[in-house]
Structure formats: structure tokens, C-alpha cells
A protein has these predicted regions:
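Flexible, low-complexity linker and terminal segments
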Residues: 1-159
Length: 159
């Protein structure tokens, strides 16, 4: 069941398809109107990138400084809205490996990126924190360094 363009009840499959197509068009339009992501660099110069959002911002800035002190250059982008606009997809396309920093257990942003963009899972590495505490710069840098050294650590809590 569905509704028609006047919000009236309908079981007409053609009307349902029309309404879903209409919603898809709105969703595509919205992606050009939402706030653009914020980049930590003027131009992407690394094959690696970090995607983060929300309350991870302050810790992420500190982590980027720590990584730079280790001579590890990683481009970074803070997502501010969904649906993702073109700049998000361009950033993803420009990088061979992306770390997705999240404060949840399930890697929801990583899953959303894969589902919406058809991105292969191997390109996206989750950096998760879900111990009830704010994520720290040390946790982020430790997880990135562990992954790059070939010794990834379990994604349980902040370390």
C-alpha cells in the first residue's frame, strides 16, 4: 500500500512507483543543498584519507597533528550532512585507503558509504570507539598505526 500525490491511500502499483521515483528525485536534489564537507587540506596529497563527523572533530584534529608529527600524511574530511554531496564521493574516489572514525559499535557511517556509493569494503577501515567515553586522539592514532603496521587491534573500546 502507498499514497498518491494528494496523500490519499492507494494500492495502485504504478502510483507507488511514481511516488518512490518522486522521493528519489527529492533525495538527489537534497544532496546538492546540504552543508558541504569540511576538508583539512586545500588539496588531496595522500593516497590515504580519514572521514569523520560529529563529536569526533576535536579528537580528530589532535590525532591529525599527532600523525603529522610521526611523518604520516593523511588527508581528512569531516562530513556534515546526509545525503552525501558530490565532494564526499570525490574525496573517496581520490584515496586508495580510507579510515572511517566513528563513536558507535556497528560502523554505521562505513556501512552507509558502502551502501550509497557501492564502495568496496576493503577500501574502508573502521576506527570505532564505543566504551561510553569520548573518543581520544590516542585511540585514533593507535588504531591507524596498528592497521598500517599489519597488526589491527579489536574494535572494542578506546585504547
Amino acid at each position: 500500500t502507498s499514497h498518491d500525490e494528494y496523500a490519499g491511500y492507494t494500492e495502485d502499483g504504478v502510483k507507488n512507483a511514481e511516488m518512490l521515483s518522486r522521493l528519489l528525485k527529492k533525495f538527489q536534489t537534497a544532496s546538492s543543498l546540504v552543508p558541504a564537507p569540511v576538508f583539512n587540506q586545500e588539496k588531496n596529497t595522500s593516497s590515504m584519507g580519514i572521514i569523520y563527523f560529529g563529536s569526533t572533530d576535536c579528537s580528530m584534529q589532535e590525532a591529525l597533528d599527532m600523525l603529522q608529527e610521526q611523518n604520516l600524511k593523511i588527508d581528512a574530511m569531516r562530513i556534515r550532512a546526509f545525503p552525501f554531496n558530490l565532494e564526499v564521493w570525490e574525496f573517496i574516489e581520490d584515496h586508495d585507503l580510507l579510515f572511517i572514525v566513528e563513536q558507535n559499535r556497528d560502523g554505521q557511517m562505513r556501512t552507509l558509504i558502502m551502501a550509497e556509493g557501492g564502495i568496496i569494503p576493503d577500501k574502508l577501515v573502521s576506527i570505532l570507539c564505543f566504551d561510553g567515553q569520548p573518543i581520544t586522539a590516542e585511540h585514533i592514532t593507535n588504531k591507524i598505526n596498528a592497521h598500517l603496521s599489519g597488526k589491527p587491534t579489536p574494535a572494542i573500546a578506546a585504547s
